[in-house]
Design a protein with these regions (language model features):
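Short beta-alpha connecting loops at secondary-structure transitions
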Residues: 16-20, 204, 245-250, 393-396
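Active-site cofactor/cluster-binding pocket
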Residues: 1-4, 9, 71-83, 87-303, ...
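Ferredoxin-type iron-sulfur electron-transfer modules and their immediate structural context
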Residues: 235-239, 248-402, 410-464
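A generic structural motif
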Residues: 12-21, 47-53, 107-113
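C-terminal non-catalytic interaction/assembly regions of soluble proteins
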Residues: 1-29, 41
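Structural signature of the thiamine diphosphate
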Residues: 25-64, 257-275, 279
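Short, Gly/Pro- and small/polar-rich lid/capping loops
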Residues: 59-79, 456-463
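Short, glycine-/Ser/Thr-/acidic-enriched flexible segments
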Residues: 20-23, 55, 82-85, 130-132, ...
């Protein structure tokens, strides 16, 4: 319509057209800057696109680094959480607390993946003394909270964090152990951008209080105490009011536990950032054994970097065709604690495998030949119970990288003489057990033909 208005006029200005928001992508300030940079050229590109990297038709404009347009009075924060850990709910309450008790303007947006419970969540919050007109996600936060330590290796959680910003990590590591386990990329970013780093073991605190895996209130309290976006006393008072409103019907015991979570949110510590981290070399690790589609498309998408994929990555898939079974390659390793099998206390009831909602623990029966090649010692297995399993060995194997740490298997395990055969241990201590699972899944043959899989719970778990 604009071009038509000026058609044929001698004084018509130069008119170029472009498209934005392709594939439902955000339109950010950096993309608008690239548009103006294009207009400033002697020969601006016409019919351009922004927000994508088009290496097929070459219509996209060169990307520009994201900038922070919000004023000093606006505070931006991102929270990375695990579906059903309470992070999103806590952040919604935080917005209500700030919006209802101060004159600040608030904005919040919450992103989820398709897994819902146990999946990836990201909360985008803005608070300011002036109206917030940012119609895009938080790309340059002042504060980032990572509520799952495994995310340090899975996602670029420091991306866009401003110079002099603040980072909060929920982790079971402390002090020197934490510094040792942080990825080089993260440590380098901390040093290069003068980031203030705090950490807290909210998982341990929640278990001590009796809240199980619900770390949200502890981390919400830590957020208010660290940022002081509103007075701490006011934040604590309002958090406790929300606790009564949310959990009052569940009894005073539940209320008291959440009160304790608020109070213990102050048990965070600061991690000294070594300036020498700036000299670290970042090496990107890639599994070259995966299929090309997994390496070049699925893994970037799973790493929340799908918007960075080039158009050429989808050549031949214009109709939306997608390979099946891609979830088998994820191996997220997001559980802080996973079960460790103690064969000495196992009665081979298979109840643990029966109750596992993610099939992350399974019984395997190995022949003598299969056992010889297995990455497990024979004396760490049991003689399989059952006449049809004569001469074979039994093992209860855990897929530690797919486990979500719910603890159902430990709860249901009868064990022997009151001692369970399963015990929750830190994920890092069990990573050497993953090859056992991988071997059993790929190399151990199914034994379902040797038993009636419909007879009882135990036999049902040998079905494949």
């Amino acid at each position: 319509d604009v071009a038509e208005c000026f058609y044929g006029r001698p004084d018509a200005p130069r008119i170029v057209s472009g498209r934005y928001g392709l594939a439902s992508k955000d339109t950010t300030p950096a993309q608008i800057i690239s548009v103006f940079d294009n207009l400033a050229l002697p020969e601006p590109k016409d019919k351009f696109t922004v927000g994508i990297v088009d290496d097929v038709t070459f219509l996209s404009l060169p990307p520009v680094e994201e900038i922070a347009l919000s004023g000093e009075s606006t505070f931006e924060a991102k929270f990375y959480g695990l579906g059903a850990d309470g992070t999103v709910g806590a952040n919604k309450n935080s917005v209500k607390i700030i919006g209802d008790n101060t004159k600040k303007y608030c904005q919040a947006y919450f992103a989820y993946d398709s897994k819902k419970s146990g999946g990836f969540t990201c909360s985008h919050l803005r608070f300011g003394d002036e109206p917030i007109r940012s119609t895009y996600l938080v790309n340059t936060p002042n504060f980032v909270a990572c509520h799952v330590q495994a995310y340090l290796h899975m996602y670029d959680v420091t991306r866009g964090l401003r110079d002099g910003g603040t980072f909060l990590l929920n982790t079971i590591w402390e002090g020197e152990e934490l510094a040792k386990n942080l990825p080089a990329k993260v440590k380098k970013y901390f040093a290069d951008h003068n980031i203030t780093v705090y950490y807290i073991n909210a998982t341990k605190i929640a278990q001590e209080i009796g809240l199980g895996n619900r770390t949200n209130t502890i981390l919400q309290s830590a957020f208010f105490r660290i940022t002081e976006v509103i007075p701490v006393d006011l934040a604590v008072e309002q958090m406790k009011k929300f606790i009564v409103k949310s959990y009052g019907k569940k009894g005073q015991d539940v209320v008291d536990k959440n009160y304790a979570a608020v109070d213990r949110g102050g048990e965070y510590r600061q991690l000294p950032v070594d300036k020498a981290w700036s000299e670290l070399t970042v090496v990107e690790e890639h599994d070259t054994t995966d299929p090309k589609f997994i390496r070049e498309v699925v893994r970037p998408i799973n790493a929340q970097a799908g918007d960075d994929l080039k158009v050429s990555a989808f050549l031949g898939r214009e109709d939306g065709t997608w390979d099946q079974g891609t979830a088998a390659y994820e191996k997220r390793g997001v559980a802080a604690f996973v079960p460790e099998w103690n064969f000495e206390n196992c009665i081979q009831c298979n109840k643990c495998a029966y109750v596992c909602p993610h099939a992350a623990i399974r019984p395997f029966v190995l022949t003598e030949k299969e056992l010889e090649c297995a990455p497990v010692a024979a004396d760490a297995t049991l003689p399989a119970i059952g006449k049809t399993f004569a001469g074979m060995r039994f093992i209860q194997s855990v897929d530690v990288l797919d486990c979500l740490g719910c603890g159902n298997c430990v709860d249901v395990c009868p064990g022997k003489k009151g001692v369970k055969a399963l015990e929750m241990k830190p994920l890092e201590t069990q990573l050497d057990k993953q090859p056992i699972w991988d071997y059993c899944v790929k190399e151990v043959t199914s034994k379902q033909d040797l038993v009636d899989t419909k007879l009882n719970v135990k036999n049902s778990q040998f079905a494949t």
